[in-house]
Design a protein with these regions (language model features):
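Bacterial N-terminal signal peptides that target proteins for export
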Residues: 1-9
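Bacterial N-terminal signal peptides
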Residues: 8-16
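Non-catalytic cap/lid and distal C-terminal segments of serine-dependent acyl enzymes
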Residues: 21-353
Length: 353
């Protein structure tokens, strides 16, 4: 009995110690706002997509109370077939951002994600009379709006650009042209790095696609994402637009089974691997460039080619491969790699990176 009594007392004491431990402090919460930003650069696009774009803005936990504090901004570009509304949970934007702040793996930043879903399920973040000038919308219209409506550190050293898949393509495409706006970029599993219509990602499938009917052109596509059937049409609208070819206003690189060399050349010219040599000086102005891609991702080869091109051209950067496919580790990469990367490389109010 004595032995039992001592054990019982020990258990009681242990229980008291366990239950008397202070509870972990709750994670401070940021917020995500859905706003509308008018894109002057998107006005008059021949697809008929609205120039008024949904934009999702993450404001960190201290934003509501630290009224004199300003924050760096990271612009996040979603992939093809997604809307901005679907992209936010796809990367776990709110919880991942709050968690990294709470754990100290990233400092507080404003995160901005525009909706680039179009009638063909994606803008390709390109400049075209058919789609509108998405390059200028991102780098000028959107940045100007955010700087004028939020407490940002409004200079290039405090702006980052990142994206996944089509958004990775947009990050490279816009980033290499606009070092005056951004100082750091993170390229996640970029698509479309070499566009060769004669080898796989071509126009034959698009040639079988009817142009959008008037209902779609008038905006009745609900914008929820997930429509991958129009990918070649989206490419053509972005890279081989033709205002003289209604109703779709683009040319396809394959016609009746035959490659159209002049059109195919336009697609190649819109490939970052073909463009990069033109923008070496711009890319060397970046404070930091990083990229990643899953080893089981069908795009890993072209992403490795971009890494090799940067190395050949003396462009400082890092590139990492990991076990995974195109989508199954995006949330983990966003939380564990993307947010810490920008936290370490952007300039905050103190002037420290």
């Amino acid at each position: 009995m004595k032995k039992y009594t001592i054990l019982g007392g020990l258990m009681a004491a242990t229980a008291t110690l366990v239950f008397s431990q202070p509870s972990a402090a709750p994670v401070k919460k940021g917020t995500v706002e859905k706003i509308t930003v008018h894109g002057k650069s998107l006005e008059g696009n021949l697809e008929g997509d609205s120039p008024d774009r949904d934009v999702f803005v993450y404001l960190p936990p201290s934003y509501a109370t630290a009224k004199n504090r300003r924050y760096p901004v990271v612009y996040l570009l979603h992939g093809y077939g997604l809307s901005g509304e679907r992209w936010v949970p796809f990367i776990n934007l709110l919880d991942a951002s709050d968690k990294t702040v709470a754990e100290g793996t990233a400092k507080e930043m404003i995160l901005v994600s525009p909706d680039a879903f179009t009638i063909y399920s994606g803008s390709m973040y390109s400049s075209s009379p058919t789609t509108g000038d998405w390059e200028t919308f991102i780098a000028e219209d959107l940045v100007s709006y955010v700087d004028s409506h939020y407490r940002t550190v409004a200079n290039r050293m405090s702006r980052g650009l990142a994206g996944h898949s089509m958004g990775g393509y947009g990050t490279v495409r816009i980033g290499m042209k606009r070092p005056d706006v951004f100082s750091s970029m993170y390229i996640m599993s970029a698509c479309c790095l070499m566009n060769n219509p004669g080898a796989g990602r071509g126009g034959q499938a698009a040639a079988k696609q009817p142009p959008p009917d008037s209902a779609k052109a008038n905006g009745k596509n609900n914008g929820k994402g997930g429509r991958f059937g129009n990918v070649q049409a989206a490419d053509a609208a972005a890279w081989s637009p033709n205002p003289s070819n209604p109703p779709q206003f683009f040319d396809l690189p394959v016609k009746e089974g035959e490659l159209q060399p002049s059109i195919a050349a336009k697609w190649v010219a819109n490939s970052p691997l073909a463009m990069v040599d033109q923008y070496v000086t711009n890319l060397k102005k970046y404070h930091a460039i990083a990229g990643d891609c899953g080893l089981q991702d069908g795009l890993v080869g072209s992403n490795k080619d971009l890494d090799a091109s940067f190395t050949r051209l003396g462009i400082a950067h890092t590139f990492e491969t990991y076990e995974g496919d195109h989508t199954n580790h995006v949330k983990e990469r966003f939380e564990g790699s993307v947010l810490p990367f920008f936290s370490n490389n952007l300039t905050f109010m103190s002037g420290k990176k």
